[in-house]
């Protein structure tokens, strides 16, 4: 939805406002800011639009928007959090693009995330080359800090922002076991107690530069559907990504270094929030299509591990 301001009251230099651009999650922000950088590049939007963001976001999410020097960020008061209440700006805007509650938009559940954001910003996705639909905006705007880890490690990311997409402990342990055959492993999850040598538990990153450094220095990222997949693309790091709730092409279609694995389940495709404990159980069962036999996991992992070991 777009709001147009009164022509007589609008100065020639009136800015563009974007409400809730681009949500509260780190991954959504990385992809949404790529769409915004493209919209500015092709002239669909003027330079430095104003992003109205809800308060009390995590430090890492705030850091992503601070890095995006092509936009200004302001606070969106909670009483304007949903589109049930028309936005009342304190100053004239050329137009206001309303992305409030986009997580509940049916189109968001059934299309590539980058395409969704581009269309919201007035850009036809098909007019943009695949190379511009990748997360190219970020790498030049951060200074990755190398982690305290051996060189050539494999980074495992089992946790997502939603428990619905978390990697089960048994899957995490199996991936760790196989990855240790190749070299040192850094995991963001709980380090299984049976693995000691060459296994490092990554403490939560204290800055965006540290998080980017953790990804940038990895030779391979193995992750569930989370922001780490988008960061791996931003730094051209090979990635093996698992998708228990979304079609992979809705997330990583344009990522040339990402091998995506779809995990079919009886959940509605594109579900964003668990409706109850049974949904979490359905998501978990998608990781075990053959019961306790994890041969399917070996078949997708081993070729990637062999390739990164060369």
Q: Each PLM stretch: what is its role?
A:
Residues 1-310:
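Catalytic machinery of carbohydrate-active enzymes
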């Amino acid at each position: 939805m777009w709001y147009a301001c009164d022509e007589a009251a609008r100065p020639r230099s009136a800015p563009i406002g974007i409400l809730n651009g681009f949500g509260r999650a780190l991954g959504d922000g990385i992809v949404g800011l790529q769409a915004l950088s493209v919209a500015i590049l092709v002239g669909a939007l003027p330079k430095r639009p104003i992003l109205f963001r809800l308060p009390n976001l995590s430090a890492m999410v705030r850091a992503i928007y601070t890095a995006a020097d092509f936009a200004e960020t302001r606070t969106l008061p909670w009483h304007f959090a949903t589109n049930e209440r028309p936005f009342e700006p304190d100053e004239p805007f050329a137009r206001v693009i309303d992305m409030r509650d986009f997580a509940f938009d049916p189109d968001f559940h059934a299309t590539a995330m980058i395409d969704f954001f581009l269309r919201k910003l007035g850009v036809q996705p098909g007019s943009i080359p695949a190379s511009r639909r990748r997360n190219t905006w970020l790498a030049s705007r951060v200074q990755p800090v190398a982690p305290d880890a051996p060189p050539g490690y494999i980074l495992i990311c089992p946790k997502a922002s939603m428990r619905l997409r978390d990697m089960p402990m048994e899957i995490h342990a199996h991936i760790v076991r196989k990855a240790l055959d190749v070299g040192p492993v850094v995991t963001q999850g709980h380090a299984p107690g049976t693995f000691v040598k060459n296994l490092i538990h990554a403490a939560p990153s204290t800055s965006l530069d540290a998080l980017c450094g953790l990804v940038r220095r990895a030779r391979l990222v193995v992750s569930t559907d989370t922001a780490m997949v988008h960061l791996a693309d931003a730094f051209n790091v090979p990635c093996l990504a698992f998708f228990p709730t979304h079609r992979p092409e809705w997330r990583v279609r344009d990522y040339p270094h990402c091998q995506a694995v779809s995990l079919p389940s009886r959940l509605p495709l594109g579900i964003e929030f668990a409706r109850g404990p049974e949904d979490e159980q359905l998501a978990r069962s998608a990781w075990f299509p053959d019961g306790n036999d994890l041969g399917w996991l070996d078949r997708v992992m081993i070729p990637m591990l062999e390739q990164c070991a060369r």
